[in-house]
Structures are given as structure tokens and as C-alpha cells.
């Protein structure tokens, strides 16, 4: 059974990055091996540019990777996951921004080939919870209703967000039982010839 240490973990923040009180930043302090995906222009979310940055970082290692994304970082992660990245093993997509707000709906429409969990909030100003549930279905992801937590960011006062950490552990477990998971991470074996 895989553990969190089996994976390289990338943190993909949204618009304006995640400040020091954001749960993503707190998780990076708790887990120093987590790597942040740095964008050149945090105030200018261009899906293709942000996605290329994430894809580049994912391809720097063959180790299976999980992405912990927030807001526009979720759209970035989905866009990257819809391309061929063999070492992407799963995604935790927290409070995704509504793709319609950024006019990128078509670019992020498709079923993911890796396990994913979408976490939505009943009062998220960036995406109504019913739409978040619909997008989770489109992506083939599990949907988790986190209650009324706003945009699930620093303003939500979540501290280290223990519930979110439990969802990350759930994602880790899903990587071993997800259809196709074994084929994604094990290299093809050459048939042996008996003499």
C-alpha cells in the first residue's frame, strides 16, 4: 500500500499565490519535501502558460507525483493532466475556480486518467458548489462537500487543515486501486525468452 512518502508532491496555488497563512503554505512547512509550482506572473493566470510550468516541473523527475491544487491551480492541474504526463499519479483539487470565469471551459473538459478528489465549499465565491460537483463528474473525480468554508483559503482560518490532510491520505490510497494505476507506474516488461 503506498504512503505519502512514495510520491513527489507538488503544490499548485491559484491567483496571487498562497500566502503564509494559507493551508497550502502551512502544509509546505509541515512537509518540507513538498515543492511549490512557481508561476512567473501570479496576477496574470494564463492557463496554457501556467500548465506548461506545471508540466515542466512534473517532467523533472520520473517519481510518481501528486499535485495539491487550489483555485486556478486546479484548472492548471486539470489542463496539465489531460496531456500525457506518465508520472502524474493523482490530484487533490481544492476549491477550483469556475472555468467559465476565465473562459477556459473547453480546455479543461475531459476525464482524468488519474484519481482526483475535488473539494468544494457551499459558499465559495469562485465556484458554486453545484457547479463544482458537475466539474468533478466531468473530470471523473470524487466530490467532497467541505461545508461552508468560503474559498477554502487563508480567510477560512483552517490552520493546518487536518481534514484536508486526511483527504490527501485518501488520495494516496486511491492511487493503488484506481483503474490503470499499475500500468501508469510500472514500466512495460519485456517478455523473457526461454531457451
Segments (PLM) and residue ranges:
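Active-site catalytic motif of lipid deacylating hydrolases and related acyltransferases
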Residues: 2-63, 189-192
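A conserved short beta-strand
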Residues: 86-99, 115
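Conserved loop-alpha-helix segment in the C-terminal half of the alpha/beta-hydrolase fold
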Residues: 28, 122, 127-141
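Short beta-strand/loop motif that positions the catalytic acidic residue
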Residues: 112-113, 117-120, 124
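Catalytic histidine neighborhood in serine/cysteine hydrolases
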Residues: 33-35, 137-153
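Acidic catalytic loop of the alpha/beta-hydrolase fold
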Residues: 17-18, 99-100, 122-127
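Gly/Ala-rich beta-loop-alpha elbow adjacent to hydrolase catalytic centers
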Residues: 67-78
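Post-His helix in hydrolase/transferase enzymes
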Residues: 49, 154-168
Amino acid at each position: 500500500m503506498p504512503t505519502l512518502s512514495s510520491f513527489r508532491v507538488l503544490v499548485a496555488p491559484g491567483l496571487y499565490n498562497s500566502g503564509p497563512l494559507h493551508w497550502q503554505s502551512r502544509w509546505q512547512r509541515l512537509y518540507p519535501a513538498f515543492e511549490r509550482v512557481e508561476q512567473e506572473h501570479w496576477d496574470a493566470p494564463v492557463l496554457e502558460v501556467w500548465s506548461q510550468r506545471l508540466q515542466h516541473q512534473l517532467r523533472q523527475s520520473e517519481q510518481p507525483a501528486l499535485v495539491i491544487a487550489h483555485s486556478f491551480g486546479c484548472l492548471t492541474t486539470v489542463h496539465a493532466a489531460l496531456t500525457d504526463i506518465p508520472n502524474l499519479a493523482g490530484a487533490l483539487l481544492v476549491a477550483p475556480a469556475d472555468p467559465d470565469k476565465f473562459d477556459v471551459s473547453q480546455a479543461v473538459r475531459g476525464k482524468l486518467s488519474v484519481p482526483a478528489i475535488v473539494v468544494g465549499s457551499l459558499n465559495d465565491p469562485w465556484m458554486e458548489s453545484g457547479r463544482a460537483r458537475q466539474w468533478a463528474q466531468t473530470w471523473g473525480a470524487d466530490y467532497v462537500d467541505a461545508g461552508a468554508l468560503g474559498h477554502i483559503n487563508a480567510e477560512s482560518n483552517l490552520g493546518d487543515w487536518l481534514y484536508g490532510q486526511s483527504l490527501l491520505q485518501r488520495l494516496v490510497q486511491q492511487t493503488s486501486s484506481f483503474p490503470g494505476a499499475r500500468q501508469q507506474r510500472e514500466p512495460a516488461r519485456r517478455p523473457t525468452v526461454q531457451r
